[in-house]
Amino acid sequence: MRTFLSSFIILTTFLASLIAAETHTWYFKTGWVDANPDGVYPRKMIGFNDSWPLPTLRVKKGDRVQLYLINGFDNLNTTLHFHGLFVRGANQMDGPEMVTQCPIPPGETYLYNFTVTDQVGTYWYHSHTGGQYGDGMRGVFIIEDDDFPYHYDEEVVLTLSDHYHKYSGDIGPAFLTRFNPTGAEPIPQNFLFNETRNATWKVEPGKTYFVRILNVGGFVSQYLWMEDHEFTIVEIDGVYVEKNTTDLIYITVAQRYGVLITTKNSTDKNYVFMNGVDTTMLDSVPADLQVNGTNYIVYNESSALPDAYDIDSYDDALDDFYLKPLSKQKLMDDADYTITVDVQMNVLNDGINYAFFNNISYKAPKVPTLLTVLSAGEAATNELIYGTNTNSFVLQGGDIVDIVLNNFDTGKHPFHLHGHVFQLIERHEAIGSKESAVTFNVSDHAEWPEYPMIRDTVYVKPHSYMVLRFKADNPVVWFFHCHVDWHLEQGLAVVLIEDPQAIQKNEKITENHKRICEKVGVPWEGNAAANSNDYLDLKGENVQVKRLPTGFTTKGIVALVFSCVAAFLGLFSFSFYGMNDIAHVEDKVARDLDIDLEAENEDEEEAVVLNQNSSSSDSNSKPH
């Protein structure tokens, strides 16, 4: 009887959730929209249905999303990624081009169709093709929670981003060129606060606001602080945390914070809400770049707006490493499988600066990796079929996985893992650029926290390392990459193939997806080289440019030998002909001018003798 009642309750709860769940259907057509986000330079931004900024999408746990993305561009492919969403059982809906799907060509429509399962919180959506989200193809995605654990009166959404006056399609080629061998990232012209500058936020006294803060930029981390107000952090990347109050927040691109802000009871004045740029990420700071943005918390529209509220140091910014999950999830068991990756930036043989994981710069395969899994049969468990330049790792379902990331670069890097949240179990402090990088030592490391911080995007500090831990319980293909868009373009990415046999069992390519692949000219079967006859034959795959040779090459030796021979011949010619011709030249000049050289020489000798006698006489006349 008890078993029957338990089953009945479970069934009733399940049916109730189905009844409560909604299906959200959106039709969005991409296109260029006239805009002037920073109020300085009009340009076109990527909008949906002739509108920009893009709309905020709101759903609840259990709801279904049916988003039809119509490519309205004339000559650009596109895709859409739902950042932070697990999209369980629907990996084709994750979005990264040539990882989980074929790109959508102009004029075609792709249906993103998935159910929002076991997630709540603050997320976003953006193009995962080229630098399109830096051109404006980005928006907020919120999964509302009827059981939100903290009290608040009103919700507010706040986005941060960097802004360029030029299009990403123009900036990218100038960045990835031999004329930029150091890999200096393009510097934004401005930084936006809710897709504008000098924004105002109208508030009421004595209220608690839940503010969802998202950095939807493509490059620079930012700081946030307020005049005479505090942030109480309660959520990070969709994960609830124990309350933590701070005056200063540091937020990298792709990260999200949910904070409570309680307003004052008085309305006699207004206050400043500042955003500041992490200038350590810039190779140089132009004199005209405004690194601090001044925005306003407005209590009284009749009162004057205050001046900027600058601070002397960013040293007191909250370190998210110490945030504890509200769920009290303990440190997972020891890892079953460890992936160690070394981050480096270097120049290849074409003179261009690339980014590397373990000396491999990611190059997209000729068949999306997910479609290789679905078509490979038993070969899907062999990492080789996914290409030598995709940095692919095959994971066993249910394994605890550690990613050890050693950063040999002198800059910070925010890394995002698709399809999962992870525990950050260690992050070493930054090491100076003139010192050697510190790498993780499994036998000598800091004590790991009992309740590690959990999120989906986290940054590694310069010349140091971090260790991430997660459970491989979402069997699909996942991208792990630096979310500085320039670094992704340079190749800083890894592909995780999680339980390929389960993927084959649970996922089938949709007819819509097949059509998209056919229209864009991308095979939907085969290995990384698009070979569907022999999955171990990678001839013709996309590979990185060759490395610069070390030491002398054959061509270099030959060039050096010929250069030396030419130099010796030149010296010999100069010496032989120069010295040999002196006498002949003198004879020729004497004949031309009818000069008697012997008589001239006798006169010169007599003059020398007279000069010597004169000098001796002068010397004797000087006082001693």
Swiss-Prot record:
- Primary location group: membrane
Annotated region Disordered: the residues are: 603-624
Offer an example of a GO molecular function term for this protein: copper ion binding
Membrane: is it a keyword of this entry?
Answer: yes
Which residues participate in Cu cation 2 binding? 83, 126, 483
Q: Which residues bind Cu cation 4?
A: 413, 482, 487
Q: Which cofactor does it need?
A: Cu cation
Residues bound to Cu cation 3 are 128, 418, 481
BP terms from Gene Ontology = cellular response to iron ion starvation; reductive iron assimilation
Residue stretches of biased makeup (Low complexity): 608-624
**Top enzyme class of this protein?**
oxidoreductase
Q: Matching InterPro entries, A to Z? A: Cu-oxidase-like_N, Cu-oxidase_2nd, Cu-oxidase_C, Cu-oxidase_fam, Cu_oxidase_CS, Cu_oxidase_Cu_BS, Cupredoxin, CuRO_2_Fet3-like
| Protein location | Cell membrane
One Pfam family recorded for the sequence: Cu-oxidase_2
EC annotation? 1.-.-.-
Signal sequence interval, chain numbering: 1-20
The residue spans the entry assigns to the Cytoplasmic side of the membrane are as follows 577-624
Residues listed as glycosylation sites in the UniProt record: 49, 77, 113, 194, 198, 244, 265, 292, 300, 359, 441
Spans traversing the lipid bilayer = 556-576
Task: Specify the Plastocyanin-like domain's residue ranges.
Answer: 46-144, 190-292, 382-499
What does the record say about how the cofactor binds? Binds 4 Cu cations per monomer.
Function (record text): Iron transport multicopper ferroxidase required for Fe(2+) high affinity uptake. Required to oxidize Fe(2+) and release it from the transporter. Essential component of copper-dependent iron transport.
- What's the protein called, per UniProt? Iron transport multicopper oxidase FET3
What species is this protein from?
Candida albicans (Yeast)
Originating gene? FET3
